[in-house]
Amino acid sequence: DVCDSLVGGHCIHNGCWCDQDAPHGNCCDTGGCVWWWCPGTKWD
């Protein structure tokens, strides 16, 4: 699934969160979370 919800500057969906200002860019793409760009998950 695609990360499509912005919460507090982070994109959160399906257990992942993505920092739009991360060094490698936004880890969310049309295919979902690009896990190797994500700094962590909301479960951490």
From Swiss-Prot:
It comes from the Eukaryota. The keyword Lyase does not apply. Coiled coil: none annotated. GO terms for molecular function: ion channel regulator activity; toxin activity. Expressed by the venom duct. It is found in: Secreted. Disulfide bonds join 3-16, 11-28, 18-33, 27-38. Signal peptide: none annotated. GO terms for cellular component: extracellular region. The cysteine framework is XII (C-C-C-C-CC-C-C). Mu-conotoxins block voltage-gated sodium channels. This toxin reversibly blocks voltage-gated sodium channel in cephalopods, with no alteration in the voltage dependence of sodium conductance or on the kinetics of inactivation. This is Mu-conotoxin-like Cal 12.1.1e. The lineage of its organism: Eukaryota, Metazoa, Spiralia, Lophotrochozoa, Mollusca.
